[in-house]
Amino acid sequence: MAKGARDKIKLESTAGTGHFYTTTKNKRNMPEKMAIKKFDPVVRKHVEYKETKIK
């Protein structure tokens, strides 16, 4: 079986709350680390989430 182009990643909050989202990313089209603004329910605000590895 061929290995797929998409990797599972974890988007972790920069607010320091420990909240995270998981998603997939096409590693061929986006080799750089992803950063996106999403809602953090712990602080109840939109904050930046940065890509980290899933352990």
UniProtKB/Swiss-Prot annotation:
HAMAP family, per the entry: Ribosomal_bL33
SUPFAM superfamilies: Zn-binding ribosomal proteins (SSF57829)
Keyword Ribosomal protein: yes
UniProt source species: Burkholderia cenocepacia (strain HI2424)
Molecular function, one GO term: structural constituent of ribosome
A GO CC annotation given for this chain: cytosolic large ribosomal subunit
Sorted UniProt keywords: Ribonucleoprotein, Ribosomal protein
Pfam families: Ribosomal_L33
Lineage top rank: taxon: Bacteria
Family: Belongs to the bacterial ribosomal protein bL33 family.
GO biological process assignments: translation
Name the UniProt record assigns to this protein: Large ribosomal subunit protein bL33
